[in-house]
A protein has these predicted regions:
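Assembly/oligomerization scaffold segments
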Residues: 1-114
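Flexible glycine-/small-residue-rich
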Residues: 18, 50-52, 73, 107-111, ...
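Extracytoplasmic assembly/pore-lining segments of large envelope/extracellular complexes
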Residues: 24, 38, 82, 97-102, ...
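Well-ordered beta-strand positions in beta-sheet-rich domains
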Residues: 33, 81-85, 104, 120, ...
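An acidic/polar, Gly/Ser/Thr-rich interaction patch typically located in mid-to-C-terminal regions
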Residues: 35-62, 240-417
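A structural signal for the main folded, soluble domain(s) of proteins
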Residues: 52, 70-71, 93, 144, ...
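Short, solvent-exposed secondary-structure boundary/capping segments
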Residues: 92-109, 216, 374-387
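Charged- and aromatic-enriched interaction segments used to assemble
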Residues: 102-238
C-alpha cells in the first residue's frame, strides 16, 4: 500500500442523515464535532456541535425537534458503520459576546419515548376454568416493545432459560390460585422503560438498541450474557490500547444473597441463599428452614464472606430468580475498568473485548458497559467502561489473553508466553 493510500485508510469519516437524506455539504462542513454515547442503561445519544456563522442554521428546517437523525462513523475509504438511529430531542444555540455562534444538536434513540409517563397494569392470560395465568416474560417483553413501535430481539439461550424457569414456577403454583396471582407480572406506576428494565434484570438480560441495517433504531435487543462470550475486539496495551485503568475491589462484595419467605402449606419459614463458587465457576443455591438461617450465616466468615439478607416480599416461586439477579449484579462489579483507544466502531454496549498486555489478573475478557465515540479536529477516539463478568471464568486464561507480565533482567516483556 502506498503512503497516500495508507494515510487515507486512517482518515476518520462520519456521515449525518436528517429526515432520511444526507445533510447538505455546507451543513456537513459546519459540523465541528460528533459525540456518540451508548450504554447498558438509558437511551443511546448523539451530540453534534455546529458552527452557526451568520446564524445561517438557526431556523433551518432540518434542525427541528423530533426530526429523524442517523450517524455513521468509520474510516475512509472503507464503508462506514451505521452507529445511531434516533430523533432530535434538544437544540441549544449559543450567542457569545465574541467568537462564532454555535448550535448543539442532541438526539436519543427511540427508547427515550418509553421513559415518558407511567402505567399500572398486569399481564395475564384469562381462562374460564382456571382463572388467570401469568404470561411468560418473553411475551411480556414483546408486547411492551411492540406497543412502543419496537421489534424485540431475543437471544436463544436467554429466551429458553426464561421460559424454562417460568414454566417451573407455573408448575409449582398450578394448584394454588393465590400463588398464580402473585406470579403475574404487574407494572405498578412505572414507565414502560423502567418496567422492561426490571423484567430484563430478573431474567439476566440487558436491553440494547440495534442500530444496524434498514430496521436500525427499531430493533430492541434483549441481550443474554450467556449467549455472548466470544470477544469481538482485541486490544493490546502499548499498541491498539492507548490507556487502561482497571479497578478490583471487595468493598460491597458478598458471598451469598439470601431472603426469608413463608410457605403457608407447611406453616414454616424458609431461607433461600444464592452464592457463587469461585473454584467451580458455578452458582450455588441453599434452601434451609427458617431456624437454620442463623446456622447458614454462622458458617460464613462475615468479614471475608458476608451474606446479604434481602428485605423483599418474595415467594418460594420468585425468590430464586430475584436472588440470582441481585447476586450477579454484585459479582459483576468486582472488577471493572475504563480505557481509551483509537476510534473503533465495533466497540458498542454489550461488546465482549479481550484486553492483552496488562497481566493475568487484569487481562482477559471484559464486557463493555458504555462507550463514547468522538470525532473532532483531534481525530477519532473511543473511550469505554467495562466489567469482568463471572461467566468469563469458564474461558481458560490463555484463551482470554490474560497472561503474566514477564520481567527478564532489566527488560519488561509484556505478552503471551
Amino acid at each position: 500500500m502506498s503512503m497516500p493510500n495508507a494515510a487515507m485508510r486512517y482518515a476518520p469519516e462520519f456521515q449525518v442523515r436528517l429526515q432520511g437524506e444526507l445533510v447538505p455539504a455546507a451543513l456537513r462542513a459546519s459540523i465541528s464535532s460528533v459525540n456518540y454515547q451508548t450504554g447498558l442503561e438509558g437511551a443511546d445519544r448523539v451530540e453534534l456541535s455546529i458552527f452557526n456563522e451568520n446564524l445561517r442554521w438557526l431556523d433551518h428546517s432540518l434542525l427541528r425537534l423530533d426530526n429523524d437523525l442517523k450517524i455513521s462513523m468509520g474510516y475512509a475509504p472503507d464503508p462506514l458503520r451505521q452507529m445511531f438511529v434516533g430523533e432530535i430531542v434538544a437544540l441549544a444555540p449559543t450567542f457569545p459576546a465574541s467568537g462564532t455562534p454555535m448550535i448543539s444538536v442532541s438526539a436519543q434513540d427511540r427508547r427515550y419515548r418509553m421513559q415518558r409517563g407511567s402505567k399500572t397494569r398486569w399481564f395475564a392470560l384469562h381462562t374460564k376454568c382456571l382463572g388467570n395465568f401469568p404470561l411468560p416474560d418473553v411475551a411480556v417483553a414483546g408486547l411492551v416493545s411492540g406497543e412502543n413501535g419496537l421489534m424485540p430481539i431475543m437471544d436463544p439461550i436467554g429466551a429458553a432459560l426464561s421460559i424454562v424457569i417460568g414454566g417451573v414456577e407455573a408448575a409449582v403454583s398450578f394448584s394454588d390460585p393465590d400463588a398464580r396471582q402473585k406470579m403475574i407480572r404487574r407494572q405498578s406506576g412505572e414507565s414502560d422503560y423502567d418496567f422492561l428494565r426490571r423484567v430484563s434484570a430478573e431474567n439476566g438480560w440487558e436491553m440494547v438498541m440495534d442500530h444496524q441495517g434498514p430496521m436500525g433504531g427499531r430493533r430492541l435487543h434483549f441481550l443474554s450474557m450467556a449467549d455472548h462470550l466470544t470477544p469481538e475486539v482485541t486490544l493490546r496495551y502499548g499498541q491498539s490500547l492507548v490507556d487502561f485503568t482497571p479497578r478490583i475491589s471487595n468493598v460491597g462484595q458478598v458471598a451469598q444473597v439470601a431472603v426469608n419467605f413463608w410457605v403457608p402449606a407447611l406453616n414454616m419459614e424458609f431461607l433461600v441463599a444464592a452464592g457463587w463458587d469461585w473454584d467451580r465457576s458455578a452458582l450455588t443455591l441453599d434452601i434451609v428452614p427458617g431456624y437454620g438461617s442463623s446456622l447458614l450465616t454462622a458458617q460464613k466468615d462475615n468479614n471475608k464472606n458476608p451474606v446479604m439478607i434481602l428485605n423483599e416480599p418474595l415467594t418460594s416461586e420468585t425468590a430464586p430468580r430475584v436472588l440470582v439477579t441481585k447476586l450477579l449484579a454484585k459479582l459483576n462489579n468486582r472488577l471493572t475498568g475504563s480505557g481509551r483507544c483509537v476510534g473503533d466502531p465495533r466497540i458498542q454496549a454489550g461488546t465482549v473485548m479481550r484486553i492483552e498486555g496488562v497481566g493475568q489478573q487484569f487481562g482477559g475478557l471484559y464486557r463493555v458497559t458504555s462507550a463514547t465515540h468522538s470525532i473532532d479536529s483531534g481525530g477519532y477516539q473511543t473511550s469505554f467502561e467495562m466489567r469482568k463478568e463471572v461467566w468469563f471464568g469458564s474461558v481458560p486464561l490463555l484463551e482470554q489473553g490474560a497472561v503474566k507480565v514477564d520481567i527478564a533482567g532489566q527488560t519488561l516483556r509484556i505478552g503471551r508466553p
